[in-house]
Amino acid sequence: MGVTSTAPHLLRAARGEIVDRPPVWMMRQAGRYMKAYRDLREKYPSFRDRSEIPEVAIEVSLQPWKAFQPDGVILFSDIVTPLPGLGIEMDIAEGKGPIIHAPIRTQAQIEQLRPLEPEAALPFIKTILQALRQEVGHQSTVLGFVGAPWTLAAYAVEGKGSKTYSIIKNLAFSEPAILHQLLTKLADAIAIYARYQIDSGAQVVQMFDSWAGQLSPQDYDTFALPYQQRVFQQIKQTHPDTPLILLVSGSAGVLERMGQSGADIVTVDWTVDMADARARLGKQMKVQGNLDPGVLYASKQFIRDRIIDTVRKAGNWGHILNLGHGVLPDTPEENVAFFFETAKQLNVLV
């Protein structure tokens, strides 16, 4: 552990230190709302190229850093990026998300999956993270991220995103032993991948269990929570000082369960009032969030008022200011700039 005072702002807050204002970053802060990103996309139309060619992914990751100086700079990637390393071939269709060419639905397919070897399968991740650390130094915190077992299983089994998750739920409720095998293999691969990101330079790691909010609480306890715990426990065994964040979309019904995952920080979405989230999670749990991304369509006064309201409700400890999910593609770029400007002045405004 380095001298604390040189640690960047977000990392200090994520460790539970008292800071003068909540650190701020934004999910999907590198993305389509930025003209610089859209220009680069014309040159590199394939998402996999943009996220797997190191110099391109480095440039994209740093676009919001150069524009807004957020307290966190996150790796530009996708949660399905490690799947080919297990033998699950995929592509990422523009505007549609991941597509798995041969969905995993049988015992035989699961048995054929191989352990993840990130040095061989994902060497570009190390190059990108090392470059981000070098670029931002102590001025910002470099974040890595991974998908959670349930959510990666949902993509692998469904073959793509879904509104109903009927195929994976059919598997979960009809042949649970098969799904548990897949979830176990995914959890172990995700833990290996997260450790690799930390070893490559990630200072904080967020795990996205985007689709776990589609589960009833009792099914969350069976198919999501134990595997979140498995991932976090394995990371903590080797990297006990790296703060870990958990996100579940539509998490209002499972918020307390998220607090049992082993995460250090729970991302709260906008369907839960931040004051209620604080009360439900308890004083020891740190939180991230939770503005509705739609707020960024509004007037500057409205945006400022919502930021101040969120920060007041979160209190003066253990809060990372963020949206409740990713910034929307048609958000006015100047409103994102204003969001960051306001966030940087919170020690005066609140």
UniProtKB/Swiss-Prot annotation:
Pfam families: URO-D. GO terms for biological process: protoporphyrinogen IX biosynthetic process. It is found in: Cytoplasm. Keywords: Cytoplasm, Decarboxylase, Lyase, Porphyrin biosynthesis. It comes from the Bacteria. Pathway: Porphyrin-containing compound metabolism; protoporphyrin-IX biosynthesis; coproporphyrinogen-III from 5-aminolevulinate: step 4/4. Substrate binds at residues 28-32, 78, 155, 210, 325. The record marks 78 as: Transition state stabilizer. Transmembrane segments: none annotated. One of its GO terms (cellular component) is cytoplasm. It catalyses: uroporphyrinogen III + 4 H(+) = coproporphyrinogen III + 4 CO2. One of its GO terms (molecular function) is uroporphyrinogen decarboxylase activity. Its EC number is 4.1.1.37. InterPro entries: UROD/MetE-like_sf, Uroporphyrinogen_deCO2ase_HemE, Uroporphyrinogen_deCOase. CDD domains: URO-D. HAMAP family: URO_D (MF_00218). Belongs to the uroporphyrinogen decarboxylase family. NCBIfam families: hemE. Catalyzes the decarboxylation of four acetate groups of uroporphyrinogen-III to yield coproporphyrinogen-III. Homodimer. This is Uroporphyrinogen decarboxylase. It comes from Trichormus variabilis (strain ATCC 29413 / PCC 7937) (Anabaena variabilis). The lineage of its organism: Bacteria, Bacillati, Cyanobacteriota, Cyanophyceae, Nostocales.
